[in-house]
């Protein structure tokens, strides 16, 4: 688990560092150098920060799919679908009459991880049954047709709840037993 986590997250760390540092620079320029938050410069710096974190499901989807020996673009596509304006935060959606819970998946980790792991099993199953002559288009098509609804209806909402619970647990540990939690989390 630790090795896979490192393979997935380490290539993404530079983007997260850049995003955080750019936000710090923007805030310094706004607070101490008179840069207007409405200026083009501030907006560009904010866009760099936002892209670094908001598109996290895309980056994670790509990396995890690559580590799991799938086509990385399929993991990125699943992440992009999850954060698309048509899905993320949209209310009243359904798929074939099954309601899709409203969630904002930007900057999330657990939902895309669950989705790509599920995609792995679907991909492997389809690999065995789809004829080679049609694999190039039929396998990705069927994979997404199966994975996306399951991700949006079941795995994404469950992953969001798990992410919130994990965040709450870490916050509770840090607030109540920081002397124990800090070495464990470090």
Task: Locate predicted features.
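Signature of multi-pass transmembrane helix bundles
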Residues: 1-185
């Amino acid at each position: 688990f630790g090795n896979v986590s490192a393979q997935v997250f380490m290539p993404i760390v530079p983007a997260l560092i850049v995003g955080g540092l750019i936000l710090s620079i923007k805030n310094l320029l706004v607070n101490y150098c008179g840069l207007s938050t409405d200026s083009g410069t501030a907006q560009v710096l904010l866009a760099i920060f936002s892209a670094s974190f908001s598109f996290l499901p895309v980056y994670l989807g790509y990396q995890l799919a690559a580590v799991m020996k799938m086509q990385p673009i399929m993991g990125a596509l699943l992440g992009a679908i999850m954060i698309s304006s048509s899905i993320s935060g949209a209310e009243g959606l359904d798929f074939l009459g099954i309601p899709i819970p409203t969630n904002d998946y930007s900057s999330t980790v657990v939902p895309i991880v669950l989705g790509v792991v599920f995609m792995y099993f679907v991909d492997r199953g389809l690999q065995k049954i789809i004829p080679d002559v049609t694999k190039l288009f039929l396998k990705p098509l069927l994979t997404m047709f199966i994975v996306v609804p399951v991700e949006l209806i079941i795995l994404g909402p469950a992953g969001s709840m798990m992410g919130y619970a994990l965040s709450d647990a870490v916050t509770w540990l840090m607030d109540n037993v920081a002397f124990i939690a800090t070495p464990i989390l470090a």
